[in-house]
């Protein structure tokens, strides 16, 4: 007995049978499909379809992008090839084989670098391809290999398998479909036989008994919902009288016509004939079209493999180019003037040709790109060869954290290689670097040393060698350093622990503490940030908190002089010194607010750090408590809360408001505004001329204020007119509609009153009018009866006269007949007399 071991290399015939079987049975009945293939199991058939024959499988060469994605996903999800395959767009077997090949290439590259690859031979290379199998080896995964060509002489088993598959696959209908088709053919034959019998009997003069008419409509004889067409303009009697000749002498097959199956066979025969006639021409055209298509696909593949061109953004705009041209023209003019003069002055001006170096300028070469595929393959190979981490050895050496695809996401990291910018590259062989520490601010590129023929500046100069520029650069560095220190967070807790030997021994013996949960750590850090933000908001001044008006620009020295000049002469020097300290603190706080919270229109440069030393929160709290206690004692409310103090101060202010207003009015009457000093002065201290000038200035100021207010009001009115114009139009329309509705209501009321009045008049006059009409109707009825009687009498007389006329006509006819008869008898008698006489 011959034993057949299923499996092995797939052949072309088996692939074709498998594809035909899948097209018939689908991709779920693998047991039925495998019954057509003698040497294959259902599992092998399924693997063959999903690993090789499926049209969606990519069999082209792997690209660099796919290799990077494969290695990156293998690093994130090791050995999960079923998950990686749909992301890469390949099958799991293809991904695994490509992964092993990349690792083998990385190993070979490392061996070449270490000088270990000289003694290798062909037998030591891995067999990654089915065609590279050594003698005696068996391919463990033949479902992923190309099919082997069919042999010229097939075995009997293969021929039997092929014939059986051809027979089974040709039968596209099942048993039930066959039975239904056979029943339809029998029904059609029965119907045709009955029709032929009926026609033959009718031709012989024998009519079959008609079936009893069913109730309802016979849809075979009648037309449901039939509507006769309307008669037209033309005579159609000839068409209706046309007699159709009976099909005498015609066979039933000719009357029935050709069936659909016969028509399909004729059409298929024509197609085969046409295909056979133009087979040679089509073959030549197909070969040419196929070559053109292959060429087009190769061109597209080359285009896809090209690196994307990334050009740098333009460093010089149109306006700057025009300025550069003007500067170059100015230099040329200066050179011509010097050249026309004395030879002694020619050495004072260097040769600064605008396009001198631009003629030989070349775009710097793009930096070499790292091979991410090889780097990732080496890293993965090193990780696979590493020992278990429980041994405590060093970590696996990787090829740099910046090289590779990274761990940022599911897709590999790509470094875009842009064309270098020649303007950002130093002409002396180095790349421009900035010495500033403020982020986002760069130094001016080396402009003067590019064309320094007189060697005024050295190679490393940026701003020049003037002392002013050096001091400016030093001050800027200090300011940036201070800003960096100011941005550092303040320490929350300061602890100093002196650990003894006993503590060290206990720490070694104690168990390690558990690691803090990430969610708890994030919540703690968030609470700390919110607390720090709240403290920063509380450190703001009251003016900033309440949004009170404040000056845009603050001159600390002038403000301090004005505040100190307002201090009343104090007998106590300590109080005067205290007032000065308070004024100094106020001036510094106002300057800090203008820098930290600038207003629109300020002249303070942005990014400037305030020099105000913010007091500690504890000191501020103690000062507020002291002020609160002193204010409560002054108001006679010791121990009162802030709310009670606020109410007490408000009540005291309301009591003194009237007195203050009266005192201010009296004081205001004795003051005038002096335009010369721009202050309010006493009237008694001015001469009449100065007083009139002050009044004139006040009148002009009032007039200007009135004009400004009028202008503002006009602008507001215009703005409101634009905003409310639509609403005004709608209001006018609504008002007009309301007026129209009211007029309609009034008109309706008038009509109703008129009709009510008419109703009353009609109700009063209707009875008399009805009585009169009834009398007229009675008269008309009586007259009609009389006329009807007269008509009946005359009608009877007419009938009598007609009867008399008919009787007279009959008598007349009878009389005429008698006369004619007598005349005829007389003629006969005369004839007899004549004959007797003769």
From Swiss-Prot:
Regions annotated as coiled coil: 250-311, 727-813
Composition-biased stretches (Basic and acidic residues): 131-151, 255-278, 520-539
Cited CDD domains: SANT, SANT_CDC5_II
Residue ranges with Acidic residues bias: 498-519
Entry GO terms, CC: cytosol; nucleolar peripheral inclusion body; post-mRNA release spliceosomal complex; Prp19 complex; spliceosomal complex
Subcellular locations according to the entry: Cytoplasm; Nucleus
DNA-binding region: 30-53, 81-103
Region (Disordered): 114-155, 253-285, 433-452, 490-539
PROSITE patterns: HTH_MYB
One GO MF term attached to the UniProt entry: DNA binding
HTH myb-type domain sequence ranges: 2-57, 58-107
BP term (GO), one: mRNA cis splicing, via spliceosome
Record InterPro entries: CDC5L/Cef1, Cdc5p/Cef1_C, Homeodomain-like_sf, Myb_dom, SANT/Myb, SANT_CDC5L_II
Alphabetical keyword list: Coiled coil, Cytoplasm, DNA-binding, mRNA processing, mRNA splicing, Nucleus, Repeat, Spliceosome
Xref: Pfam families: Myb_Cef, Myb_DNA-bind_6
UniProt xrefs under SMART domains: SANT
Summary of subunit composition and partner proteins: Associated with the spliceosome.
Function: Involved in pre-mRNA splicing and cell cycle control.
Family label: Belongs to the CEF1 family.
Protein name (database record): Pre-mRNA-splicing factor CEF1
Originating species: Cryptococcus neoformans var. neoformans serotype D (strain JEC21 / ATCC MYA-565) (Filobasidiella neoformans)
Name of the gene: CEF1
